[in-house]
From Swiss-Prot:
The lineage of its organism: Bacteria, Pseudomonadati, Pseudomonadota, Gammaproteobacteria, Pseudomonadales. It catalyses: 5,6-dihydrouridine(16) in tRNA + NADP(+) = uridine(16) in tRNA + NADPH + H(+); 5,6-dihydrouridine(16) in tRNA + NAD(+) = uridine(16) in tRNA + NADH + H(+). Its cofactor is FMN. It comes from Pseudomonas aeruginosa (strain ATCC 15692 / DSM 22644 / CIP 104116 / JCM 14847 / LMG 12228 / 1C / PRS 101 / PAO1). It comes from the Bacteria. One of its GO terms (molecular function) is tRNA binding. The active site is at C98. Belongs to the Dus family. DusC subfamily. HAMAP family: DusC_subfam. The keyword Lyase does not apply. This is tRNA-dihydrouridine(16) synthase.
């Protein structure tokens, strides 16, 4: 059984990957997608979204990182995948699930679920282009506006050479609205001969256990649930290993929140850093009442030094 951290554009960047993997329980993580159009990208484009390539493709906690590509041109994706491997990517993941309209309009992500033959050709081209010891994997949704083609899409990926398939148990049109249709993950798992990971609407350990029961799949990829409850992967891993299952208290999260902010201040432009903190803190309000109070204090602030002072007060009060 494996527990993975999902790739989420504009959310799970290098900073959040670093912080979340240090909590524990995550077996591997994936970069935000690197968009491939009609040319070979320079190394700087890969290092921008996957700086861990310079550190053995691992986060500071030692968690392996995989590089995700998104596009619709099999040959161009293959060339860029091969180059990513030269830069140190240990696994190439292919995105067939992004629901963003801007991405879909440029023929990327979930819109490709309308074309299973092209999905097959993309995976096959990338599989041929990268060294045999490097796995090619894929992530899909159940379909564009209906799950009727889910099995054909999954078979296309597996037959093309995908070592496993992650299934976000919703269609593109569903977006992120509940429920996740875990019963369709079970159907996909029966249709292909490669491992299948379930993804979608797992916010708690109990959710994971229900997902496992309904889907028959034990491997899980956690997205918003893990961002909102950073100890979730650790809880699932403890359940798997027969260890102690405990909640992550706010006092344990605070040092990570502080480090997240310090990294954001150092690595992002001043106009972007506050938004990233508010984004994560806003998601933490789902789990932590303390996050609700802290979010209320900073939500209208855009000056980094002001936020520094407000955070320091909050951290001091919690100590």
């Amino acid at each position: 059984m494996q527990i993975a951290l999902a790739p989420m554009e504009g959310l799970v960047d290098e900073i959040l990957r670093d912080v979340l993997t240090r909590v524990g329980g995550i077996d591997w993580c994936v970069t935000e997608f690197i968009r491939i159009t009609d040319r070979l990208l320079p190394a700087t484009a890969f290092h921008k979204l996957a700086p861990e390539l310079r550190d053995g493709s691992r986060t500071r906690a030692g968690t392996p990182m995989r590089v995700q590509l998104l596009g619709s041109d099999p040959a161009c994706l293959a060339d860029n995948a091969a180059f990513a491997c030269e830069l140190g990517a240990p696994v190439i993941d292919l995105n067939f699930g992004c629901p963003a309209k801007t991405v879909n309009r440029s023929r990327g992500g979930a819109v490709l679920l309308k074309e299973p033959e092209l999905m097959h050709d993309i995976v096959a081209a990338v599989r041929r282009a990268v060294p045999s010891e490097i796995a090619v994997t894929s992530k899909m949704r159940l379909g564009y506006d209906s799950p009727d083609g889910a099995l054909d899409c999954a078979r296309a990926l597996a037959d093309g050479g995908s070592a496993h398939v992650v299934v976000h148990a919703r269609t593109k049109v569903d977006g992120y609205r509940p429920p996740a249709h875990w019963e369709w993950v079970a159907r996909v798992a029966e249709a292909v001969r490669v491992p299948v990971f379930a993804n979608g609407e797992v916010w708690t350990l109990d959710d994971y256990l229900r997902c496992r029961e309904v889907s028959g799949v034990e491997d899980i990829m956690l997205g918003r649930g893990l961002v909102s409850r950073p100890g979730l992967a650790r809880q699932i891993a403890a359940w798997r290993d027969g260890g102690e299952i405990r909640e992550m208290p706010w006092s344990e999260l605070l040092p990570l929140l502080r480090d997240f902010w310090l990294q954001a201040r150092r690595k992002l432009a001043p106009r972007y850093a506050p938004g990233r903190l508010k984004q994560w803190l806003g998601m933490l309000t789902r789990t932590y009442p303390e996050a609700v109070e802290l979010f209320a204090r900073i939500r209208r602030e855009s000056d980094c030094e002001t936020i520094d002072r407000l955070l320091q007060v909050s951290f001091s009060q919690a100590a």
